Amino acid sequence: MCLGWHQVTTEQSSKAIYSGISSAGAMNVIAPTWFSLSDNEGNFTSLADSGYVAQAHGAGKKVWGLVDDFKKGIKLSQVLGSTTSRTKLINGLVGKAIQYDLDGINIDFEHVTKDNAAAYLEFLRELTIKAHINELVISVDNYTPAAHNAFYNIKEQGKVVDYVILMAYDEHYQGSEESGSVSSLEFVKNGVASMVASVPKERVVAALPFYTRLWKESKSKGGKPTSQAYGMSAAETILKSHDTTAKWDDTTGQYFAQYKDGGYTYKIWLEEETSLGKKMDEVAKQKVAGFAFWKLGCERPATWSTIQKYCK
């Protein structure tokens, strides 16, 4: 399996299938970010479009609608803890999937806590049962397993849903205490190893980044750096504009570059075809179900040639 997340933010953009789909021959599932929880009573907003689905199916791609919990004020303990609101959400999601002829639903709830984890798992159980009755696939996005997020209970998730997706990125993120790689080779290897230790490998999907971060170091001692996310081509354009050449870094399995501008030091660990290939090579050794990529539009046409070697 090879999934590409398509970030959709407006009704207008939801009507257009990803423009680079012709180059993405290896991709067999596209997941538009169509659904978002809108309150604590089981309602959600929808950007779903039947024309989009028809285009995707015509191109040989299955469509999994993504639902997130990113809106400010959403309290999963209320949404999922109440049988009434939980059932309303499940019926609504499956209803939309049927209405728009979707092939699956991708759950991207990133604000699960220890207090609502049990309700979250019950939501996944009930959703999967109803989804399977209607021949829909359920996948769930997860952080790299660690002690501080053990309550996500990936072992139980693996017994319930069809695919458990490891988001093998954000090793360093906006707000990190120090600059660093978004997804180093060792980070990916360790994350996948942790995941397959708890979830059957045939249900594990490794998600890798098409984006990187340009870090601006703080001038003050002990100050936190700031960063901006860029796609592959944009990152290389920045380096060229500063007459800077990236050099291979064996430690991260990536090309690294740094330069000074306006008295500030900038650092970047590139995500491009070579580093992506090395990560995919390591993941493939674990014989997992497939790969996913965040996000479509940050890659280059040539990137799919690398992906094609592992997604056949």
What annotation goes with each model-predicted range?
Residues G58-K61, N116-A118, E122, L127-I129, ...:
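Short acidic, glycine/proline-enriched helix-loop-strand junctions
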Residues H6-V8, W34, G65-D69, F109-H111, ...:
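A cross-domain feature marking catalytic cores of carbohydrate-active enzymes
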Residues M1-G92:
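Glycan-recognition patch characteristic of GH18 chitinases/ENGases
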Residues S275-K312:
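Acidic/aromatic/glycine-rich contiguous surface patches that form carbohydrate-binding/processing clefts
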Residues F210-D281, C311:
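Glycan-binding loop/region signatures in secreted carbohydrate-active enzymes
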Residues D39-N40, N91, K114-S241:
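Substrate-binding surface in catalytic domains of secreted glycosidases
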Residues I30, I107, V164, A206, ...:
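Conserved, mostly hydrophobic/aromatic
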Residues T9-A24, G81-Q99, A146-I154, L270-A284:
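Short, acidic/polar
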